[in-house]
């Protein structure tokens, strides 16, 4: 009975580690996606501003 309890505890720890890893991976992918979109937005804004200023002058 005791050995079964220890086994369950180890399984639970494995599940927790997996769960936290999943969260970390999700957070990092979200950061990558948002950084990429921010980069694209900056480039698009810079191009738009350049076009506007070149038309103005």
From Swiss-Prot:
Task: Tell me the domain of life.
Answer: Eukaryota
> What's this protein's name?
Putative uncharacterized protein YGL188C
Record organism: Saccharomyces cerevisiae (strain ATCC 204508 / S288c) (Baker's yeast)
**Organism taxonomic ancestry:** Eukaryota, Fungi, Dikarya, Ascomycota, Saccharomycotina
């Amino acid at each position: 009975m005791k050995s079964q309890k220890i086994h369950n505890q180890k399984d639970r720890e494995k599940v927790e580690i997996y769960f936290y890893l999943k969260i970390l991976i999700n957070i990092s992918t979200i950061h990558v996606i948002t950084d990429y979109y921010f980069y694209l937005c900056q480039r698009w804004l810079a191009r738009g501003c350049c076009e506007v200023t070149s038309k103005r002058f």
